[in-house]
Amino acid sequence: MLTLSDFDFDLPPELIAQTALPERSASRLLEVDNTNPSAPPRLIDRRFAELPACVAPGDLLVFNDTKVLKARFFGRKASGGKIEVLIERVTGERIALAQIRASKSPPPGTTLTLADAFDVTVGERVEPFFTLHFPDNCLVLIERHGRLPLPPYIEHAPDAADETRYQTVFAANPGAVAAPTAGLHFDDAVLAALEARGVERATLTLHVGAGTFQPVRVENLAEHRMHSESYELTDALVEKIAATRARGGRVIAVGTTSMRALEAAARDAQAAGRPLAATRAETDIFITPGYRFRVVDRLVTNFHLPKSTLLMLVSAFAGIETIRAAYRHAIDARYRFFSYGDAMLLTRRDDAAEATHGGA
């Protein structure tokens, strides 16, 4: 059985990208050709602008169109005590769930002043979050007064450049507290080149929660409690997937968030004895080696943190030894890691279950 230690690696800290490159598609792309099971993976160093040459006419790229909220607030209690609030999810026009960092957890009924601009009232606890009641439309107040919640490994305060570059060019539906980072590499030129090549495009929405940065704290992966996120698949997307399958094309997920939404919906549909259909749901899917993929054939993704659930996901998809070889190469070749870093293009290995853990 695989354990947490199987997904550890040493990363020189200087390879953690702290800022975005001047041009989105100037990032590097490591194409991993693992289609020959009897040979080591072929690792091809490219620029992201070359992605259209790596995919075929008739393929389908599936993007996550979530938009990152300015979800971080600094504020104070009525007593003057300092607090930090991270909005996790907007659940109603004037209601949100949030994490609150304070010297003492505020009880229901407490008034908090955020950004010296407005007050919220603490409602019931929905573990591990607090319910916050806003005086007006949540999304408007968050956009007007909040701060962009950069990942914990990015050391600078968010600036004007981050407000542009920590969003995808196709972001449309506000609700995430972290960017779907594989999408950050796509610019208008790359999207136009994909269209000219005859590659189809579709979108889904998965609002990325702060749990994406949650460390795995148990050595036995079966004991890990995965965070839950909301997602939506439309009829248009489901129809495009069916059409892609019918013409022999490949479904390519842009990012692990797109992957998780597609695979969660397909798994649940299969369990219910029905075909994939439009849906709006919650998922806490935890993909580890041994998982049987139902929808996605290829994956565009960034380089992930050691011991992270996302590293486990890509290992399940492409094979543990393939990912280990690719990461060794990326470190030796000085690729940039994590949210503002470079990308990989992976292909599903149907024999990727080199070791198994609770597949389904």
From Swiss-Prot:
GO terms for cellular component: cytoplasm. It is found in: Cytoplasm. Its EC number is 2.4.99.17. Pathway: tRNA modification; tRNA-queuosine biosynthesis. Its main location: cytoplasm. Pfam families: Queuosine_synth. GO terms for biological process: queuosine biosynthetic process; tRNA wobble guanine modification. Gene3D superfamilies: QueA-like (3.40.1780.10). Keywords: Cytoplasm, Queuosine biosynthesis, S-adenosyl-L-methionine, Transferase. The keyword S-adenosyl-L-methionine applies. It catalyses: 7-aminomethyl-7-carbaguanosine(34) in tRNA + S-adenosyl-L-methionine = epoxyqueuosine(34) in tRNA + adenine + L-methionine + 2 H(+). GO terms for molecular function: S-adenosylmethionine:tRNA ribosyltransferase-isomerase activity. Monomer. PANTHER family: S-ADENOSYLMETHIONINE:TRNA RIBOSYLTRANSFERASE-ISOMERASE. Transfers and isomerizes the ribose moiety from AdoMet to the 7-aminomethyl group of 7-deazaguanine (preQ1-tRNA) to give epoxyqueuosine (oQ-tRNA). Belongs to the QueA family. This is S-adenosylmethionine:tRNA ribosyltransferase-isomerase. It comes from Burkholderia mallei (strain ATCC 23344). The lineage of its organism: Bacteria, Pseudomonadati, Pseudomonadota, Betaproteobacteria, Burkholderiales.
